[in-house]
């Protein structure tokens, strides 16, 4: 921890969140050390020569002036980790900001750590079962993988995130860490309130909560937004490496991490790269992403919301992110408008795990048949709109009927949405999911009405619902 021999310098220049500090000869703090001046914590980013360093502030530099004394803390920023973090909200420095009292600093870790060695990695790819039918069947997540979550406002990103947090806790005995990177303060507050309401955070007994929250919102300096992802990741690494758990790490939004790095890079005087981004874009992204992985002890599976500026997928920020992703989950406004939740687009969502040698032939064939049926239905929709269903061939009418059942069967009641829908949530195993879709596509359930498949768990519930509709 902190060395007792204090090393002090003084401020020579302040430009916004960037501070130049002069230290005594031979006492320069190394890069990434944290230094503190009048309650403002900064991180050393550059050694300038002439005994001066350039540091980036993690909080506002209001009130600082030249000549003020700066203390080197002789260590990088360190944050609390472990069970005491569950149910709490932290800032980039690991300080609780939820007015729920202090957090035990008994166990802390520095936010800058090396990624696991190759010998520690779990090399055999395995599926991370979420209990959500559409995800597990059509775009399965890799244990220790990275998933991009794409979707506009109001299509159900937050509810999907909360359901995943709930399911990993129940099915895998795991915990989650949520890193709010450069998003709206209001959204962070709404998420916290919804988590309390749905039981993901247990306000009366915090140790039973399933998630720790780390926020660096868009009103904060770029230094905080650039480092808050590392703070969340450090907390997740402790649960993986020490508690040997499966961890879900949510980063909302990974684009803001890049954006903050771009701001800091410009403030540090680096020459910009393509589209004005930092020249170190790939390195910064790689440093974060390489720490998110499976080891033999546990795993960190990361779900990252990806904002695509001006819907341009070739922009360097999303393009760099894509190279790290194992799967993409795309939320569709059209499905949300139809009331099909989760509104995951079955044709746009992809996964590198959907290969015969990984998931097996039954899973692979079922997924391809489902996609084929839905694609054919999509192609026929224009004809149906112009000429009507009666003008289709017998075979196409059957395809449409089955596709509509498949589409409805991809919906599912969520545990965290129980308070809104009144329907109890359902966790559906992968085997049950495959069995259900096979029965629909094989024509075994052609006589059942399509509304029987809407918002049910496994196929037995759909059959039961059909019987109650008849009765």
Curated annotation (Swiss-Prot):
Which InterPro entries does UniProt cross-reference here? AAA+_ATPase, ATP-synt_VA_C, ATP_synth_F1_bsu, ATPase_a/bsu_AS, ATPase_alpha/beta_chains, ATPase_F1/V1/A1_a/bsu_N, ATPase_F1/V1/A1_a/bsu_N_sf, ATPase_F1/V1/A1_a/bsu_nucl-bd
SS bond list: none
Q: Catalysed reaction per UniProt?
A: ATP + H2O + 4 H(+)(in) = ADP + phosphate + 5 H(+)(out)
The way it spans or sits in the membrane comes to:
Peripheral membrane protein
> What's the chief localization of this chain?
plastid
- Identify which top EC class this enzyme belongs to: translocase
**Gene Ontology annotations of biological process type:** proton motive force-driven mitochondrial ATP synthesis
Task: Give the record's GO CC terms.
Answer: chloroplast thylakoid membrane; mitochondrion; proton-transporting ATP synthase complex
Name listed for the protein in its UniProt record: ATP synthase subunit beta, chloroplastic
Identify the coding gene.
Answer: atpB
């Amino acid at each position: 921890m902190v060395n007792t021999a204090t090393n002090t310098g003084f401020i020579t220049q302040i430009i916004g969140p960037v501070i130049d500090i002069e230290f005594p000869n031979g006492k320069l703090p190394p890069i990434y050390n944290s230094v503190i001046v009048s309650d403002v914590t900064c991180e050393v980013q550059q050694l300038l020569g002439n005994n001066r360093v350039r540091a980036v502030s993690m909080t506002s530099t209001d009130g600082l002036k030249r000549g003020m004394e700066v203390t080197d803390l002789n260590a990088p920023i360190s944050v609390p980790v472990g069970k005491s973090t569950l149910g709490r909200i932290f800032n980039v420095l690991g300080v609780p900001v939820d007015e729920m009292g202090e957090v035990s600093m008994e166990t802390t870790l520095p936010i800058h750590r090396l990624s696991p060695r190759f010998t520690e990695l779990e090399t055999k790819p395995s599926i991370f079962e979420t209990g959500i039918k559409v995800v597990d069947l059509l775009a399965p997540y890799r244990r220790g993988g990275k998933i991009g979550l794409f979707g506009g406002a109001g299509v159900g990103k937050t509810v999907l995130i909360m359901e995943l947090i709930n399911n990993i806790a129940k099915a895998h005995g795991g915990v989650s860490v949520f890193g709010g990177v450069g998003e709206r303060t209001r959204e962070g507050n709404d998420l916290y309130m919804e988590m309390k309401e749905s039981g993901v955070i247990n306000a009366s007994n915090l140790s039973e909560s399933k998630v720790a929250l780390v926020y660096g919102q868009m009103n904060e300096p770029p230094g905080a937004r650039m480092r808050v992802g590392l703070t969340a990741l450090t907390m997740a690494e402790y649960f993986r490496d020490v508690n040997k758990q499966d961890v879900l790490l949510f980063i909302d939004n990974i684009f803001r991490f890049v954006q903050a790095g771009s701001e800091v890079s410009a403030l540090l005087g680096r020459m910009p790269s393509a589209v004005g981004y930092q020249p170190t874009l790939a390195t910064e992204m790689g440093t974060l992403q390489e720490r998110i992985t499976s080891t033999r002890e546990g795993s960190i599976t990361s779900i990252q919301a990806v904002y695509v500026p001006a819907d341009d997928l070739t922009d360097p920020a999303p393009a760099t992110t894509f190279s790290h992703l194992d799967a993409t989950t795309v939320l569709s406004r059209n499905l949300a408008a139809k009331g099909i939740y989760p509104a995951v687009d079955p044709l746009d969502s992809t996964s590198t795990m959907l290969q015969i040698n990984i998931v097996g032939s039954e899973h692979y064939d079922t997924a391809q048949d489902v996609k084929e049926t839905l694609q054919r239905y999509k192609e026929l929709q224009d004809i149906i709109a112009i000429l009507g269903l009666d003008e289709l061939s017998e075979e196409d009418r059957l395809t449409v009927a089955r596709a509509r059942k498949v589409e409805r069967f991809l919906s599912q009641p969520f545990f965290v949405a129980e308070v809104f829908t009144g329907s109890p949530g359902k966790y559906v195993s992968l085997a049950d999911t495959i069995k259900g879709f096979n029965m629909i596509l094989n024509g075994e359930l052609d006589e059942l009405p399509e509304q029987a498949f809407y918002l049910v768990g496994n196929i037995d519930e759909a059959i039961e619902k059909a019987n109650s509709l008849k009765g």
